Curated annotation (Swiss-Prot):
Described purpose of this protein according to its UniProt entry: Negative regulator of class I heat shock genes (grpE-dnaK-dnaJ and groELS operons). Prevents heat-shock induction of these operons.
Family according to the record: Belongs to the HrcA family.
Pfam families: HrcA, HrcA_DNA-bdg
Molecular function terms from GO: DNA binding
Annotated coiled-coil segments of the chain: none
NCBIfam families linked to this entry: hrcA
Keyword annotations: Repressor, Stress response, Transcription, Transcription regulation
UniProt-recorded name of the protein: Heat-inducible transcription repressor HrcA
Annotated InterPro entries: GAF-like_dom_sf, HrcA, HrcA_C, WH-like_DNA-bd_sf, WH_DNA-bd_sf, WHTH_HrcA_DNA-bd, WHTH_transcript_rep_HrcA_IDD
Keyword Transcription applies: yes
GO biological process terms held by the UniProt record: negative regulation of DNA-templated transcription
Gene3D superfamilies xref list: 3.30.450.40, Heat-inducible transcription repressor hrca homolog, domain 3, Winged helix-like DNA-binding domain superfamily/Winged helix DNA-binding domain
Amino acid sequence: MTDISERNKLILEAIIEDYITTAEPVGSRAVTKRHGLTLSPATVRNVMADLEEMGYLVSPHTSAGRVPTDKAYRLYVDSLLAVRRIDKVERERIRKRYAEAGRDIGAVLHETSRLLSSVSHYTGIVLAPRFSATIFRHIEFVKLGGRRILVILVADNGTVQNRLIESDEEFSSEELIRMSNYLNELLVGVPVGQVRTRILEEMRNEKVLYDKLLARALQLSEQSLNDDGAQIFIEGQTNILEQPEFADSRRMRDLFRAFEEKNQLVGLLDRCLNAQGVQIFIGAETHLSQMEGLSIITSTYLTGKNTLGVLGVIGPTRMGYAKVIPIVDYTAKLVSRLLEGE
């Protein structure tokens, strides 16, 4: 950014930090008084007018003060922000929460969304690992009523998915056990994304052609793996509704719609899967119209070098970036260690 002088950056930083704290449009007198600048209010006023012309500030109709734009927050995050470390007490509090969550991956991820919400005071969000990105460990068919079968799928990272399927014919419990044993022997250690290929290869096997039960086992397993819908955990939506900029009913409605239409959020989080480290989307950068006025800070969590999913915090564009960025970063690293069994 070469279009803004150091003095103007200093004043813009002061305005942004005041607005983050107060949620009120910031005037020139407040900037000089709160930040001890050796500049007159008139000089600051002129700078604010310049910053508005450059697209960093806007003037609400009802106020003489100014409000930062998405462009201002982007400059703030990229160039002006001093990110602080999480203090020892906060780190211990986060680790203790995970100790209470146990080792079940679903419980860990659900607790992560709650923790991110409670520590940041905004909304915590976690995209669970896609089953197709894991390694197959175990499948079990459980007979329910009629032709309904509960399929329990287990991945090498501990992810468990339960799926209900309707079979074309009825099987006994003994037949389902034999089918499960056959598939477990065939598929253990195979990447889930390659399971269908392995199944199609096996269907050409002469043994399968003459064993109807094995053929049906392969068909059932393919049916079971057909749905790889994303699982997303969201906690603390009401924290955003308590922010003054979301007080009017239209903004509130849009916000609820954004959280209800999870496919759009999943699409945004999917974009983060190929990026390492913390990602920050400010306002319009999310490309989600219903998330106007919101920012999202995310980071991937991993096992080894394999990206499993994404976690993060959604808050107003005036969120406390200096506090939230290290929380998201630390939590992602801690979740990665937990899932690796450290």
